[in-house]
Design a protein with these regions (language model features):
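Single conserved hydrophobic/aromatic residue that forms the stacking wall/gate
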Residues: 1-11
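Divalent metal-coordination and catalytic microenvironments
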Residues: 5, 56, 70, 116, ...
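An anion-binding catalytic pocket shared by soluble metabolic enzymes
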Residues: 9-67, 74, 83
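Structural motif
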Residues: 13-14, 64-67, 74, 98-100, ...
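Short acidic/glycine-rich loop or secondary-structure boundary segments that cap or lie
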Residues: 24-25, 74-78, 110-111, 136-137
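Class I SAM-dependent methyltransferase SAM-binding "motif I" and its flanking Rossmann-like core
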Residues: 72-107
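A structural-propensity feature for long, helix-poor, extended segments
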Residues: 95-129
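A conserved C-terminal secondary-structure "cap"
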Residues: 115, 122-187
């Protein structure tokens, strides 16, 4: 239906924040319209991470908005390059029984994008080794809420492991929780 309205293939281009600009100074006109090959129509350069945004949109039909952040706790946990196990049931909000950590690759590369796509299998959020986090949702608000929740989970995980090895919820318990969170915040 979208192409018939003359809008073309919406997954061939995206709106993304510019590279190197402080978020608290962004204006509407600073947002960069970028095509899937990285071409853009302004003097501002798109974020170097446009590639993995594009690939998430292409591979995850339910991704309508993406939040990528170098939030302090997620970045700290990501520096260990390990998945976060089900130490808390809220892990399920990301869509699985753990928070996956994408393997490290240099920022802005196809390799990083591929690693993120692998880590997002059956999930809506992941850590990016030695980098930060990425989360997506059906709109910007839900993507941002999930990114905030992932940051909270990482903070809790840091505090938990200070006390030793946490008790990990079983796969069967996480299956029950995953079923329950399908309708979380849906009224």
């Amino acid at each position: 239906e979208v192409p018939s309205r003359g809008l073309g293939d919406v997954y061939k281009r995206q709106l993304i924040t510019p590279s190197g600009k402080k978020y608290d100074t962004l204006k509407e006109e600073d947002i960069v319209f970028v095509s899937n090959d990285g071409n853009h129509d302004t003097n501002l350069k798109p974020s170097s991470e446009w590639r993995f945004h594009k690939d998430i949109y292409l591979k995850k039909p339910d991704a309508k908005a993406i939040v990528h952040a170098h939030s302090p706790h997620a970045t700290a946990v990501s520096a260990h390059g390990k998945d976060i196990p089900a130490f808390h049931y809220m892990i399920a909000l990301a869509g699985g029984d753990s928070i996956k950590c994408a393997k490290y690759a240099t920022f802005g590369t196809q390799e990083l994008s591929d690693n993120i796509i692998d880590a997002l299998e059956d999930r809506k959020a992941c850590l990016m080794s030695n980098h930060g986090q990425v989360a997506f949702g059906e709109n910007l608000e839900s993507a941002f809420e999930l990114a905030e929740e992932l940051e909270n989970i990482c903070h809790q995980y840091i505090n938990t492991i200070k006390l030793g090895d946490p008790k990990i919820l079983s796969s069967s318990e996480m299956d029950v929780i995953l079923e329950k969170v399908k309708n979380y915040k849906k009224g």
